[in-house]
Amino acid sequence: MTKDEKYISRCLQLAHNGLCNTAPNPMVGAVIVYHDTIIGEGYHIRCGEAHAEVNAIRSVKDENLLKESTIYVSLEPCSHYGKTPPCADLIIEKKIPKVVIGCMDPFSLVAGRGIEKLRKAGIEVTVGVLEEECRHLIRRFITFNTLKRPYITLKWAESTDGFIDINRTGGKPIKLSNPLTSMLVHKKRAEHDAILVGRRTALLDNPSLSTRNWYGKHPVRLVIDKELTLPRDLELFSGRIKTFVFTRKSPHQPNTLTEYISLDFSKDILPQIMEVLYQKKIQSLLVEGGSILLQSFIDSSLWDEAFIEKVPLCLKNGIEAPSSQKKYFKLNKIYFGREIMHAVHPQNQRQNVAD
């Protein structure tokens, strides 16, 4: 690992501290180095507050050292006025002579302009250090800004013989997840802006779709209810968490936290849902079920990541798990006793985000 890679790696570590809090902004970390000694660090804590570069500069006790220092940042410094002033201007103002950047910012108001501004000011700029790792960190932000849709994560648990539930018209679903994997699912919920289920899952499971087993915000809850036949006493309509209902009808009893959105069900509704979520600035979507809904995303090649829990249990029959003839690019396996959580990307889409 080179010196630049070492400090950008530290930027990535810092950036992760902003997980669940920065959206719709990306997670960013920054490190300031004076003669091979770190004199300042910072990360973007939450949207609307100071960016990583600002926090790193503020942490330096002797600002006179900045004139002989290098600032490392995982993402290109911004060059526009948003909720905060441009970071590129602050770097220029503090006369920091060198900037090392992990990856360029895909956001249209930046997209190389920060780098250009720094270079025009006579600052030495290096770009592309640990670029793949830096892009992976902000994969949700990149997908949203380049593909104009949320980053989509699929999640399900299945038995060894490929079923996600027993055949039923009521009662509780069969419990496949253990307490540890259930907690991991709630962590994933906290990391996403929204969570989607179909009508059958909402009716039979009556899920809260909350993060009760993990700290952090609740995602916006999404449910497809074409004919508005779901009972109003379901947990989804409790009014405690923001909920979108996709339907072809007009609502009967709207409330402040339940929004009804009309779709054209004579056409494919997934692109319509993606457009709605993009307009509402929802950058990441977790799809939890059921099997038909998950399969529709797979068949449409409309997913970026999947978490598949393999459970050492044989059901023999029931609701079949989603399947795909396409090859997965396996990222890693997480073991919980005899259970395995597979984290995978569709091979044809990995290049769009990470490379």
Regions found by a protein language model. Name each.
Residues 22-36:
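N-terminal glycine-rich anion-binding loops that anchor highly charged ligand groups
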Residues 138-149:
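Flexible, polar/acidic helix-loop-strand segments at domain edges
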Residues 1-8, 12-26, 41, 61, ...:
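Enzymes that bind and transform nitrogen-containing heteroaromatic metabolites
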Residues 51, 82, 109-110, 136, ...:
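Residues that form or flank phosphate/diphosphate-binding pockets in enzymes
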Residues 115, 131, 135-138, 182-189:
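Hydrophobic, well-ordered secondary-structure segments
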Residues 69-79, 147-158:
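N-terminal pre-triad scaffold of radical SAM enzymes
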Residues 32-133, 220, 298:
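Zn2+-dependent cytidine deaminase-like catalytic core
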